[in-house]
């Protein structure tokens, strides 16, 4: 969100703020848009808590978890990384965060996945199974991006 509009209208539309894209009947007010966004977030969080992952993704994550020995936090991070790399809008939204430090990546993932920061840090650390197996690593070159299957 910028001062008088959205940086990306397609992302605003995707998160349910389409009535604020070029509003003709009112002035774009950041505080009102932010309040609408938080209201939408509360609703979406409740909906998502009830919604499982797509069956194929869940199946594949479970198979990899069994093969590699991933725990529940590893599985959630892996599933999120897959979604991040396969959903263009989610990837674009993540790109808007620009460069994140490793610590900021851990904190953001912990918040998004509703798991303790320390568990995310351990899962994505160099000794974590995700990194050792080559499934997911954090790009430490400055971008802070999650890299899925970095060994390809």
Please identify what each model-predicted range represents.
Residues 1-152:
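Intrinsically disordered, low-complexity N-terminal extensions of AAA+/P-loop NTPases
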């Amino acid at each position: 969100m910028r001062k008088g509009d959205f940086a990306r209208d397609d992302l605003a539309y995707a998160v349910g703020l389409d009535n604020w894209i070029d509003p003709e009947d009112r002035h774009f007010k950041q505080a009102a848009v932010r309040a609408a966004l938080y209201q939408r977030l509360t609703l979406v969080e409740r909906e998502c808590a009830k919604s499982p992952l797509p069956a194929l993704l869940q199946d594949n994550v479970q198979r990899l978890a069994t093969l590699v020995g991933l725990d529940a936090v590893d599985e959630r991070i892996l599933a999120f990384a897959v979604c991040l790399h396969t959903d263009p809008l989610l990837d674009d939204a993540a790109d808007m965060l620009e460069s994140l430090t490793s610590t900021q990546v851990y904190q953001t993932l912990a918040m998004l996945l509703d798991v303790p920061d320390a568990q995310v840090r351990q899962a994505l650390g160099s000794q974590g199974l995700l990194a050792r197996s080559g499934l997911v690593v954090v790009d430490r070159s400055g971008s802070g991006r999650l890299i899925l299957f970095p060994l390809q």
